């Protein structure tokens, strides 16, 4: 049987560019090469699609954070939308076009805006090209934490208390210092309890997230809102929840099938090298191996673990999920579960929760990739 030709995409214009590269490298190494022929396609930070660039198989977190560059020998990728699955070409130096051949599916291992937000999913929908992952609606809604909460709340799924701010009306020149009292008034009116977490609505990997600990400190709050605004003008201010953060991997390779949920896992934060405890920020996730470790299943009663699994599946269905997602939840001391956010293209690095959770549930990394791809093949 002929191998299926799969375009694996990585990089992109988002802040998560390098993590996407590492995720794709891990996925490519795990790909069943007896079944699939992979064509790696990178997207540079300025949005250029290239093929035959640097080989991503050599990338790992141990070597730092890679970026997609147009190296000598790399070719621009050109799409002919009307040709659908036969519409992928590499532009040669003399301007001629070399076809990829029939592309059976695309695996967009892209995180953040322009990759995980419904835009590229819409492109492949227009081309009629099968792709791994959530569709346009779920991708767009889950990229925006505000609208994720709107959908979940409408489905009766508990979410953290919070408010949403529009930073476009704030004074950027003063770094929002002149808006500090007005921002504080909105938080006070909502009755939010400290600590607060201020985060961009449409960013991932903890970019722009700040913990605000001092109640009544308008300057600290305004500074946190300004930091978040560097990534997005829509900003969430959420009440900190006295709970454990438990993550659950959801898998639904074929449209219309019931989603499956892994054993829930927990990122256990360890002391940082400098001796400080802190929340799970970008450095804790990717740059400091001593900052945390993963436990799957999480050390919780089985009844609570099953409640997390059921909540994750309900959340996945509520946003019209497809393919895969990682549902992040809060579990309180009395066993209540609320959803924090949904990642429609979770990390696939060697330390990422999604593949680790499925491995602990009995699905090997290679089999996981195979299930995801075969689920969308025609």
Curated annotation (Swiss-Prot):
Its EC number is 6.3.2.4. Binds 2 magnesium or manganese ions per subunit. Keywords: ATP-binding, Cell shape, Cell wall biogenesis/degradation, Cytoplasm, Ligase, Magnesium, Manganese, Metal-binding, Nucleotide-binding, Peptidoglycan synthesis. It catalyses: 2 D-alanine + ATP = D-alanyl-D-alanine + ADP + phosphate + H(+). It is found in: Cytoplasm. ATP binds at residues 189-247. Residues 149-374 form the ATP-grasp domain. InterPro entries: ATP-grasp (IPR011761), ATP_grasp_subdomain_1 (IPR013815), D-Ala_lig_Van_CS (IPR000291), D_ala_D_ala (IPR005905), Dala_Dala_lig_C (IPR011095), Dala_Dala_lig_N (IPR011127), PreATP-grasp_dom_sf (IPR016185). SUPFAM superfamilies: Glutathione synthetase ATP-binding domain-like (SSF56059), PreATP-grasp domain (SSF52440). GO terms for biological process: cell wall organization; peptidoglycan biosynthetic process; regulation of cell shape. It holds the Pfam family Dala_Dala_lig_N. It is an enzyme of class 6 (ligase). The keyword Cell wall biogenesis/degradation applies. Cell wall formation. Belongs to the D-alanine--D-alanine ligase family. NCBIfam families: D_ala_D_alaTIGR, PRK01966.1-4. This is D-alanine--D-alanine ligase. It comes from Bifidobacterium adolescentis (strain ATCC 15703 / DSM 20083 / NCTC 11814 / E194a).
């Amino acid at each position: 049987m002929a191998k299926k030709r799969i375009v694996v995409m990585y990089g992109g214009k988002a802040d998560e560019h390098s993590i996407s590269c590492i995720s794709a490298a891990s996925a490519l190494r795990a790909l069943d090469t007896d079944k699939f022929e992979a064509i790696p396609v990178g997207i540079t930070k300025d949005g250029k699609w290239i093929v035959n660039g640097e080989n991503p198989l050599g990338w790992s977190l141990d070597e730092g954070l890679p970026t997609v560059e147009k190296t000598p020998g790399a070719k621009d990728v050109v799409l002919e939308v009307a040709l659908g699955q036969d519409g992928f070409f590499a532009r040669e130096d003399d301007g001629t076009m070399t076809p990829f051949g029939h592309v059976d599916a695309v695996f967009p291992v892209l995180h953040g805006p322009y990759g995980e937000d419904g835009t590229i999913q819409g492109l492949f929908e227009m081309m009629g090209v099968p792709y791994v992952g959530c569709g346009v609606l779920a991708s767009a809604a889950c990229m925006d934490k505000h609208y994720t909460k709107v959908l979940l709340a409408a489905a009766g799924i508990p979410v953290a208390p919070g408010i949403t701010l529009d930073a476009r009306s704030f004074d950027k020149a003063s770094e929002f210092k002149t808006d500090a009292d007005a921002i504080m008034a909105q938080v006070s009116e909502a009755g939010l309890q400290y600590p607060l977490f201020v985060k961009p609505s449409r960013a991932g990997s903890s970019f722009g997230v700040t913990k605000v600990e001092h109640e009544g400190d308008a300057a600290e709050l305004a500074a946190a809102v300004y930091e978040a605004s560097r990534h997005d003008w829509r900003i969430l201010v959420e009440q900190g929840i006295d709970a454990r953060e438990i993550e659950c991997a959801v898998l639904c390779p074929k449209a219309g099938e019931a989603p499956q949920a892994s054993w829930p896992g927990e990122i256990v934060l360890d002391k940082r090298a400098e001796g400080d405890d802190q929340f799970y920020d970008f450095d804790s996730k990717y740059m400091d191996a001593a900052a945390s470790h993963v436990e799957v299943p999480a050390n919780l009663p089985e009844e609570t673990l099953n409640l997390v699994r059921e909540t994750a599946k309900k959340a996945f269905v509520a946003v019209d999920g497809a393919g895969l997602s990682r549902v992040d939840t809060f579990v309180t001391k009395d066993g209540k579960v609320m959803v924090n956010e949904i990642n429609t293209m979770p990390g696939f690095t060697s330390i990422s929760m999604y593949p680790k959770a499925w491995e602990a549930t009995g699905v090997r990394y290679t089999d996981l990739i195979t299930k995801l791809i075969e689920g969308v093949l025609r």
